Amino acid sequence: MPGLVPPPDHSKSLFVLAIGITVVSALFVLKSHTFPIAGDNIHRFPSGGQYKDGTKQINYCPPTHARYPKYPDYKWLAATAAIVIPLCLYISYHPGNNIRRICPCCNTYHHP
């Protein structure tokens, strides 16, 4: 059967294609700037900052406590939830409690 030949090996070309897609994706992510740029028609503050001269004073992106005084800080709520939820799960599934549960496989009661 001289007409049968093995299929060509595309692993090297696919490897080069994967490297190219990775490089292009990395460059796209590093070069894209999606945040709004603060400033006016003369001064640009992409990361915040301040400008002051004789007649003009601009202050963009001050510290968060001065910028958003009316919004409360919910870090304590997240920390409390991170402690309380696992504690409740531990208490409810602890082998020491005498709650009998129905087994979803055999539909009978088993002691934990």
From Swiss-Prot:
It comes from the Viruses. Pfam families: Plant_vir_prot. This is Uncharacterized 12.4 kDa protein. It comes from Cymbidium mosaic virus (strain Singapore).
